């Protein structure tokens, strides 16, 4: 299928892009600038598109992002350190983010005559982000079937929706994803901080997957104490 991948430049979506490139006809990568503090992830998405030899389009929705206040990703709120847990990561929720992006992505896909959109939501996000859950994916597909009825038939692919982050690392390694060129850290510094929830989750995923982590972290050992604290 001619498939457009929504790609942030993170480990999950880059792994997905490489998987789609091997299983389908990858037509383009689509990214969104919503005013996120970790905007450097978009550079990783661009590099991924160049490696895969497909177009990369960035949709500017910063005006929308500016209205979605109250999130550490779009507002002047500190990103918390610690394990990827509900009590620490709830502050990173951007209301309706995936719904907004997917609505635009379906429109772009229809205009470009694509047959599918792929999104890298995964099982580890279910307890924090409601628009990463299977029910949301199924409902959004149904909604788009009605929205594009008679105009386009586009499938929403979410192959990681029941997978763990470690599963994605294994899948990415299988398909040759360049992990070192991906960006996860929500703080958006020069290097991955190693302390925020996404950094801890990333580091733990490589450990559980048994895959070497090529990422340069400012604090490479914090993840161990964060996990010990979670398990205490």
UniProtKB/Swiss-Prot annotation:
The EC number(s) this enzyme carries: 6.3.4.20
Membrane spanning residue stretches: none
Keywords: ATP-binding, Ligase, Metal-binding, Nucleotide-binding, Queuosine biosynthesis, Zinc
Family in the record: Belongs to the QueC family.
Binding site for Zn(2+): 185, 193, 196, 199
GO MF annotation, one: ligase activity, forming carbon-nitrogen bonds
BP GO annotations: queuosine biosynthetic process
Pathway given in the UniProt record: Purine metabolism; 7-cyano-7-deazaguanine biosynthesis
Protein name according to UniProt: 7-cyano-7-deazaguanine synthase
Domain of life: Bacteria
